[in-house]
Structures are given as structure tokens and as C-alpha cells.
């Protein structure tokens, strides 16, 4: 009996030992109890963004190749249709924009839901920065999706955009498409809420969403909406903050 118990203990310990989570990134469905846990989840979201189907390659290739800024020579990667406009409905290259974008949104929504539960239970942790980053990232994801799958804002804002999903959904959920106008309204709301939660300073680590990241995205979103005064005001806030400097000459290998 002692050997049986010892064996069971050994196997249990081994399973626990092997089933370790990464310390620098994680899935939002895991346990979140502290600000540090929330940041690990945000790291995981940002890691997911680097997929080749999103910011790791295809998002940039899609726009630049279609705009004539570059030509794709490498064959066999499924990217030829980017510049030939020869799309097919069963190409995984294009569905990746949708699936990766909504995967990132799911992670953000789950994180925000977990934080809300912690706050309601009386947690003393200050999740303001984590929530601000998460809302800013969700705005970015929806901005990317509506630009890819919806018409330009002032061309037909009442036309279909993408589903506005702001909470975790079950696997069988079938959210309906919102209008382009509703998408942009959600984007601006997330940016406004996010900016109010972020400290008005530059993050110490490059690559993370901070207050000025949020304001820069506001400028870009408003530019796409042809709200030129709003875009200018947001851009001016960053320029006049003294935190960043404009590049006088943007050249490779580094701007000057």
C-alpha cells in the first residue's frame, strides 16, 4: 500500500512539474489574481499578435502588395493573390486575419472579465494599467478587422462591419455583424476608457501599449473617420508632450 501511495504521489508530482505555465506570457483563461498575472496575459496577447497571419507578416503584406508598394516573388506561401487580387473563399491566408484577430479579442475579453470578478470580490490590486492596456489593444484589433472586412467609414457607415464582441462567448455563440458605425463607436469607447486608466507617461519597456500609444491610435482612427480636427488634436497632444520626437528623415537602418 505504501508503494502504491508513493507511486501515485510520484506521478502526481511529475504531472504538476511538467505542466508548468510560461512565466512571461499566458492564456487569459488561466488563473488571474494579481496585477503581475494580468501582465503575463497581456504579454500572451501581444505574442499572439506576432503570428505570421497577423502582425508577423500578412497584415502588412496585404495592404502594401495590393497598393503596389511591393511585389511578392516567393512562391508557395499562399500570398500571390495579395497583389493579383485573385482571392478564393477557401484560402486560409485570408481567414487568418479573422481568426487571429478574434482570438486576441477573446483573450482580452476573458482578462477583463476576470479582473471585473476580482474587483467585485474586493481585491485590493490596482488593475488600472492592465485594463487600460487591454482596452487599447482591443480597439486596435477591431480597427484592423473593420478596415479589412468593412467599407470605409464615410463611404457607407451603415453597411455591415464585424461582430462587436466585448465579453467571453461560448463556443456555440453566433454573434451578428455590427455596422461599420457601431464598430467605430466601440473602438472610440475602448480608447476613451483605456486612456482614462493609463498613467500619462511613456512605458519603460518598448513595445507595450501606454497612454501615448492610445492617443496615437485615436489620431489614426479619427483620420480614417475623416475627423481631421480630432486627429490633429490627438497628434498634437503627443507632439507637444515632449515625450517623443518626430523623425526628420525616415531611412534604413534607423530613422534620424
Report residues per predicted region.
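Membrane-proximal, proline-rich intrinsically disordered regions
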Residues: 14-61
Amino acid at each position: 500500500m505504501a508503494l502504491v501511495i508513493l507511486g501515485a504521489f510520484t506521478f502526481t508530482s511529475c504531472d504538476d512539474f511538467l505542466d508548468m505555465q510560461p512565466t512571461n506570457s499566458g492564456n487569459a483563461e488561466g488563473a488571474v489574481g494579481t496585477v503581475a498575472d494580468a501582465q503575463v496575459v497581456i504579454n500572451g496577447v501581444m505574442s499572439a499578435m506576432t503570428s505570421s497571419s497577423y502582425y508577423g507578416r500578412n497584415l502588412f503584406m496585404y495592404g502594401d502588395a495590393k497598393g503596389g508598394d511591393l511585389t511578392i516573388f516567393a512562391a508557395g506561401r499562399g500570398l500571390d493573390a495579395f497583389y493579383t487580387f485573385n482571392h478564393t473563399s477557401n484560402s486560409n491566408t485570408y481567414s487568418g486575419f479573422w481568426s487571429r484577430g478574434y482570438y486576441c479579442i477573446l483573450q482580452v475579453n476573458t482578462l477583463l472579465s476576470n479582473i471585473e470578478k476580482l474587483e467585485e470580490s474586493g481585491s485590493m490590486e490596482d488593475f488600472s494599467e492592465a485594463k487600460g492596456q487591454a482596452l487599447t489593444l482591443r480597439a486596435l484589433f477591431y480597427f484592423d478587422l473593420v478596415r479589412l472586412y468593412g467599407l470605409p467609414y464615410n463611404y457607407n457607415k451603415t453597411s455591415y462591419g464585424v461582430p462587436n464582441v466585448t465579453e467571453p462567448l461560448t463556443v456555440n455563440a453566433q454573434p451578428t455583424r455590427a455596422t461599420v458605425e457601431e464598430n467605430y463607436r466601440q473602438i472610440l469607447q475602448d480608447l476613451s476608457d483605456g486612456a482614462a486608466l493609463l498613467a500619462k507617461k511613456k512605458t519603460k519597456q518598448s513595445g507595450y501599449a501606454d497612454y501615448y500609444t492610445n492617443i496615437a491610435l485615436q489620431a489614426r482612427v479619427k483620420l480614417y473617420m475623416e475627423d481631421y480636427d480630432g486627429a490633429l488634436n490627438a497628434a498634437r497632444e503627443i507632439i507637444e508632450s515632449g515625450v517623443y520626437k518626430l523623425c526628420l528623415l525616415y531611412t534604413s537602418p534607423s530613422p534620424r
